[in-house]
Amino acid sequence: GAEASNYPFCTIDQNVGTAPVPDPNLQQLAGILHPSEVTPASIRFVDIAGLVPGASRGEGLGNQFLAHVRDVDAILHVVRCFADPNVAHTTGEADPRRDAALVETEFLLADLDVAERALQKWSHAARTGVADAKEAAAAFEHVASGLRQGTAVRALHFTDKELVHLAESRFL
């Protein structure tokens, strides 16, 4: 695994672990279907370095952190809720609400950057007559508008057409 120590920016590489997902029905199904191989489900956990204010602008390991986060299917955010002078904290002291809000804010800002770049691209394409570009631009404007108001992409509501245009965007 990657190094993990008690000081900021010590964890550069991600730590990865895999755990089986128990399924009592798996053997029953195998008995009925007789497959050549039975492969139980598993879940892969990726522990990545934390972030600091300004990560969405590349500060600290921000760009690397956000790239790792974009590659996962789900995010489990673990927040430190204890004070211990022997365990360093990037801001000097643990404040769970502030720390959780920091991550959420950095995600919103990073997503806003993605949405605004896509909006610019599709707006230009719409001016040159590219098919569906106006619809794509409208979808990204919807996202950008919500993010500017502090609403995460996951909390916004989209039409099926908007979802088609947003599908490859890898929002956090």
Language-model features: locations:
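Short secondary-structure junctions and interdomain/linker hinges
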Residues: S36-T39, A110, V114, L147-R154
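C-terminal-of-GTPase-core extension/linker across diverse P-loop GTPases
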Residues: A118-L172
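Charge-rich, low-complexity amphipathic helices
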Residues: N15-G17, H34, L51, T91, ...
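Amphipathic alpha-helical coiled-coil segments with heptad-repeat character
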Residues: G62, E93, A100, T105, ...
